Amino acid sequence: MTEGTAGGRNMAAELLLLGVLATLWGASYTFIKLGVATIPPVTLIAARTLIAGSLLVLVLRGRGMTLPRGRAVWLRFLFQACLNSVVPFTLIAWAERSVDAGLATILNSTSPIFTFLLTAVFVRHEAVTARKLFGVVAGMLGICLIVGVEALGGFGRELVSQLAIVAATICYAGAAIFGRSFKGLDPIMPAAGSLLCGTAILVPASLLLDRPWLLAPSTASLLAL
């Protein structure tokens, strides 16, 4: 096998994985929309975060890895949890009670643009080029075409909810930048650690605010978890 052939196959595999990731990420908004139909936003996100965190802990154990125990790193996990799960997940779930899943996907696709802007302001050592700006704008336009530009028809009718999704997107951008501080760790560790911290915040909030034992969620909402 030539080096060029191997490189082409690697690129194809990476593009396939990227496509799968984009599909799963986009579908998550549909699942959230189904979930909040009968489950309050905080409880829905608490359950999803608990499930995701538990799965990652199992993966860690399966790989023979353990989470770090230092106080400093867990404070960083906690901060990352607020940026990457607690605040944005809850905002999106709350907003999707009135915003269509397609429009939520499009609004969230602005995350690379906010990452670009925040990087330009706070991470001065990275070059900001027209090529990068073109890339993120082209990516957002591509998502609009995939989801369907008709989803933009609801833009402006539920402004507060839509702004909540944009705020969540800015949180994701901040999380992407802050996540670079975990370079010394295996990527699964900050993911698992931050989800566990998010669970520790969201589950008590759910118990206090929603009293989930009194809820009667639909089968569709439960499956959306």
Regions found by a protein language model. Give the residues of each.
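Transmembrane alpha-helical segments that form core, pore/gating elements
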Residues: 56, 115-117, 153-212
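Loop-to-transmembrane-helix transition segments
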Residues: 13-23, 58-61, 65-93, 108, ...
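Alpha-helical transmembrane segments of compact multi-pass small-molecule transporters, enriched
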Residues: 16, 28, 51-55, 107-122, ...
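Juxtamembrane helix-loop-helix junctions in multi-pass membrane proteins
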Residues: 23-54, 94, 100-102, 174-198
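Hydrophobic transmembrane alpha-helices of multi-pass small-molecule transport proteins
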Residues: 56, 78, 117-118, 128-150, ...
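Membrane-interface helix termini and inter-helical loops of multi-pass transporters
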Residues: 30-39, 94-98, 145-160, 206-225
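Loop-to-transmembrane alpha-helix entry segments
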Residues: 68-72, 76, 105-108, 124-145, ...
